[in-house]
Amino acid sequence: MSEREERRFVEIPRESVRLMAESTGLELSDEVAALLAEDVCYRLREATQNSSQFMKHTKRRKLTVEDFNRALRWSSVEAVCGYGSQEALPLRPAREGDLYFPEDREVSLVELALATNIPKGCAETAVRVHVSYLDGKGNLAPQGSVPSAVSSLTDDLLKYYQQVTRAVLGDDPQLMKVALQDLQTNSKIAALLPYFVYVVSGVKSVSHDLEQLHRLLQVARSLIRNPHLCLGPYVRSLVGSVLYCVLEPLAASINPLNDHWTLRDGAALLLSHIFWTHGDLVSGLYQQILLSLQKVLTDPVRPLCSHYGAVVGLHALGWKAVERVLYPHLPTYWTNLQAVLDDYSVSNAQVKADGHKVYGAILVAVERLLKMKAQAAEPNRGGLGGRGYRPAEDLPWDSLLLQESPPGGSSETGFGSGLPPPSGVAGPEDPSSLTLADIYRELYSFFGDSLATRFGTGQPAPTAPRPPGDKKEPAAAPDSVRKMPQLTASAVVSPQGDESPCGGTLATATAASESRPLPRVHRARGAPRQQGPGAGTRDVFQKSRFAPRGAPHFRFIIAGRQAGRRCRGRLFQTAFPAPYGPSPASRYVQKLPMIGRTGRPARRWALSDYSLYLPL
């Protein structure tokens, strides 16, 4: 058993060690040769084990000479040269005994230099792209290199840096404005670029001060807009600082009086501007940023302010980002948001207010998605195919949020601009292709009448009759197709405090106002209805019969319930008071058409104050 354990590894005999020593002119005893043979076996096993680790790390099954040389260098041993050839070395036996050695052929350098045949290269010709940027000193910096920490600045640049930082972080707004304008146009501050980027990266240390965060974002905006600066390796740091202001739950957001929403809007717009103007430098960040926004949006532990930042960030990156990230996760996210909005407890008031912010941001994003999808479906619609037409992806659409105007009058992309991914940018895979009607029907089930964009969701228009031989398809269920809600107007003219809708008071009021009651037209049930220019609508006030006391005043109140398939809905009521100013009575002589259908006939009497209640 002991002999088997001793023979688990291949051992070099002491005779081989003695022969190697004699070839160099040394004589060894048996004890020394045995000790050297044992040590040589251990060193070879160690080098072989390390070289096999290098082979496994490169996912290969063949051990090469380079792996063995790496193992020798790892053990601080000089590498063995001359064995890296792909061809096997010829071995020759010695005459004296069973000893083999590699054959070393003599090579004539003169014949090799004067040879006419040129050896072919071992590898195929390949082209490798290497991008270099100019650093602050005018030298070429290789791609991905980190600038050195120690750099020498002139006294003028150092004074400029100190004055600008004091002006930006100081208390004088006019001086800060001048400093930011100079940062945006100065062409001699390339050496100070890493220092200003380091200042902008300090947003993580001042998350409790919104004013300082706004100023640092303005510094980043000025650096990005400077046409004389090449951001190069610093653009990743700037994008990270901007994303911190967009997504992170800042310490200043704890106080509800702090307007951190504007900070997130401005940071999202700045992120869109970076991708629009420096797409070649951030080509590898588009996918990572979309994944970061998606991760924050789908995390229920994150606060609602972070969800708001994720939504406005997707909106700033364009409607395609909204379609690929926000729209697929909307059904899952809507359940949690609806639970927050339906909680009417006093302790949930602030969280509910934040939920309404997120609700509004999602509404603005999906409305832009609907508009851009509609324009993509109808490219030849009027106004889009004429003179000066540009694709939908290139149009700098306006937004309801913060907008910026670039220097020099150049157009700049705002929120929801349909910004396409920059050249060379690979975005996430497109979701399942859905038609505009399917997307609108799905969004209408969430938002109801809050959507400003309107498309038909009811039954399709009747088509031509089918031949008798065709099989009639079953009609869709009433619940499966959601129709647009219909406004119902109840035209009830309310009397004033001293008047009553009864007969006597009505006659007195009529006589006082010197106006005749409206004649009633009795028509037989089978008589045909008169067709005119206003066919299909009914007028509330068919004639101008106002009292001489002055022009009447109208108060419109629209109320209803925002309902959907996934929620009970919320009641809402909005009043639209008319301006009380001097206006001629002829302004109200025009006919007001009814909205929808009337539930009952209107009762009329002469008044100077009318009320129109429109429940949904």
From Swiss-Prot:
SMART domains: TAF. This is TAF6-like RNA polymerase II p300/CBP-associated factor-associated factor 65 kDa subunit 6L. Signal peptide: none annotated. It comes from the Eukaryota. Keywords: Methylation, Nucleus, Phosphoprotein, Transcription, Transcription regulation. CDD domains: HFD_TAF6L (cd22932), TAF6C (cd08050). One of its GO terms (biological process) is regulation of DNA repair. InterPro entries: ARM-type_fold, Histone-fold, TAF6, TAF6_C, TAF6_C_sf, TAF_TATA-bd_Histone-like_dom. It is found in: Nucleus. Its main location: nucleus. Residues 399-432, 455-539 are annotated as: Disordered. The modification Phosphoserine is found at residues 494, 500. Functions as a component of the PCAF complex. The PCAF complex is capable of efficiently acetylating histones in a nucleosomal context. The PCAF complex could be considered as the human version of the yeast SAGA complex. With TAF5L, acts as an epigenetic regulator essential for somatic reprogramming. Regulates target genes through H3K9ac deposition and MYC recruitment which trigger MYC regulatory network to orchestrate gene expression programs to control embryonic stem cell state. Functions with MYC to activate target gene expression through RNA polymerase II pause release. The modification Asymmetric dimethylarginine is found at residues 549, 555, 587. The PCAF complex is composed of a number of TBP-associated factors (TAFS), such as TAF5, TAF5L, TAF6, TAF6L, TAF9, TAF10 and TAF12, PCAF, and also PCAF-associated factors (PAFs), such as TADA2L/ADA2, TADA3L/ADA3 and SPT3. Component of the STAGA transcription coactivator-HAT complex, at least composed of SUPT3H, GCN5L2, TAF5L, TAF6L, SUPT7L, TADA3L, TAD1L, TAF10, TAF12, TRRAP and TAF9. The keyword tRNA processing does not apply. GO terms for cellular component: nucleus; SAGA complex; SLIK (SAGA-like) complex; transcription factor TFIID complex. It holds the Pfam family TAF6_C. Belongs to the TAF6 family. One of its GO terms (molecular function) is RNA polymerase II general transcription initiation factor activity. Disulfide bonds: none annotated. The gene is Taf6l.
